[in-house]
Amino acid sequence: LLVDKPSGISSRDCLDLVRKILNEKKAGHCGTLDPLATGILPISIGEATKFSRYVSNLPKKYNVKILFGLETDTGDITGKEIYKTDAKFSTSELTKVLESFIGIQDQIPPMYSALKRNGKPLYYWARKGISLKRAPRSIEVRDINLKSIKKKEEIELEISCSKGTYIRTLVQSIGKSLHSAATVLELRRTHIGPFNENNSVKLDSSKDFYLKYILGSDEALKIFPKIVLSKEETKKIINGLQVDYNARQEKEGIVRLYEEEGS
């Protein structure tokens, strides 16, 4: 189920509400969104939870509104002010800096995140005023599109990136590269893999409405090649035997296996 998460609640709160409406014990969300953020949040239900990690690993696209000249402890406008500074840079300087962030890079996750440390999420320690050392993680920013400049201090970007990319951290890095500071005003996830916000449903929907829009597990796996097995091959797979289907696959990796129609 592709839910349009509203601002002001956590991804877990969103999941719990959907689980309650559908009366489903087994469910999970694929790809955490910050409480401030809105947008597409895939929720796997029942047996589809087995495929959650594949959806979570899909590339994402975000729209983000940025305020320059301000840095907060959370990296967004909901946090405590750390300091203010000037935002003195030209459009050409901004464009050059944005281009410099496209590509594979290391990023240190923020303290205000759901990553676990010593059995607790990092934000638990951050709220206690404790900063823990975090190992950098490899991410990829595939594209950054400058959508608008409303004021000198406020811009809107469209960012395409890999899983595990923290937009708040990226925004702070952009601010520092411009010899300024930056914080997230608004953040919306518009795409995750083949799914976009037009496929999502509002959170405050009824069970009957949700049931109309629940997708089959297969929809989440269409990024993988499809291979149809013969009756004999199907029997081998069921009995735990190997099947050679390399001739039908262009490269190594995960595939979707289907029974031959009618078998």
Model segments located where?
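Short, structured patches in soluble enzyme cores that scaffold and shape functional sites
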Residues: 66-68, 127, 143-148, 159-163, ...
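The conserved catalytic core of RNA pseudouridine synthases
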Residues: 20-24, 42, 132-179
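Residue-level signal for inorganic ion chemistry
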Residues: 43, 64, 119, 170, ...
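Glycine/acidic-rich beta-strand-loop module
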Residues: 26-56, 124
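Accessory RNA 3′-end/elbow-binding domains used by RNA modification enzymes
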Residues: 1-4, 10-33, 37-40, 92-100, ...
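Acidic, low-complexity central loop/insert segments
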Residues: 54-106
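Structural signature of FAD isoalloxazine-binding scaffolds in flavoprotein oxidoreductases
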Residues: 53-68, 132-146
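Extended alpha-helical targeting/anchoring segments
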Residues: 113, 117-142
